[in-house]
Amino acid sequence: MPSIKLQSSDGEIFEVDVEIAKQSVTIKTMLEDLGMDDEGDDDPVPLPNVNAAILKKVIQWCTHHKDDPPPPEDDENKEKRTDDIPVWDQEFLKVDQGTLFELILAANYLDIKGLLDVTCKTVANMIKGKTPEEIRKTFNIKNDFTEEEEAQVRKENQWCEEK
């Protein structure tokens, strides 16, 4: 199987099977634009928004999911589920918050829908059922609202709380 070289933002080169790399719509488009559809090339494809540690994790995820069917298109009318993360992905995403957020940014930049979905669902599960104070604690967010501002926000968004 032909391979290509991907270069991380910190200069590390990764040799990857073309089909695995093409799970990224961004890379697939780059290869098509450069006329490198199926045959490898010696020049690395620069990925300035992804460092080596994160690119290594992205490649690991893509390799594991190489035979998966393409993820379905989002249906805006359909409620999104967050309880359907495969066990392998749950284990893979047991990382620190910084790494998880870097994976979200990389999946978004590289346009890898499946990875973006599971990383975002993981964050959604970290928030689900928590009070604003618990969410702030989980993500180390400082509350910079005054009591008056907080009361105003609660009043404006009261409809959200109605059951």
Curated annotation (Swiss-Prot):
The keyword Ubl conjugation applies. The modification Phosphothreonine is found at T131. Keywords: Host-virus interaction, Isopeptide bond, Phosphoprotein, Ubl conjugation, Ubl conjugation pathway. Undergoes autophagy-mediated degradation in the liver in a time-dependent manner. InterPro entries: SKP1, SKP1-like, SKP1-like_dim_sf, SKP1/BTB/POZ_sf, Skp1_comp_dimer, Skp1_comp_POZ. CDD domains: BTB_POZ_SKP1. GO terms for cellular component: centrosome; Cul7-RING ubiquitin ligase complex; cytoplasm; cytosol; nucleoplasm; nucleus; PcG protein complex; SCF ubiquitin ligase complex. Pathway: Protein modification; protein ubiquitination. There is a cross-link at K142 (Glycyl lysine isopeptide (Lys-Gly) (interchain with G-Cter in SUMO1)). GO terms for molecular function: beta-catenin binding; cullin family protein binding; F-box domain binding; molecular function activator activity; protein domain specific binding; ubiquitin ligase complex scaffold activity; ubiquitin-like ligase-substrate adaptor activity. Interacts with KDM2B, forming heterodimers. The KDM2B-SKP1 heterodimeric complex interacts with the PCGF1-BCORL heterodimeric complex to form a homotetrameric polycomb repression complex 1 (PRC1.1). Component of multiple SCF (SKP1-CUL1-F-box) E3 ubiquitin-protein ligase complexes formed of CUL1, SKP1, RBX1 and a variable F-box domain-containing protein as substrate-specific subunit. Component of the SCF(FBXW11) complex containing FBXW11. Component of the SCF(SKP2) complex containing SKP2, in which it interacts directly with SKP1, SKP2 and RBX1. (Microbial infection) Interacts with vaccinia virus protein C9L. Essential component of the SCF (SKP1-CUL1-F-box protein) ubiquitin ligase complex, which mediates the ubiquitination of proteins involved in cell cycle progression, signal transduction and transcription. In the SCF complex, serves as an adapter that links the F-box protein to CUL1. The functional specificity of the SCF complex depends on the F-box protein as substrate recognition component. SCF(BTRC) and SCF(FBXW11) direct ubiquitination of CTNNB1 and participate in Wnt signaling. SCF(FBXW11) directs ubiquitination of phosphorylated NFKBIA. Belongs to the SKP1 family. This is S-phase kinase-associated protein 1. It comes from Homo sapiens (Human).
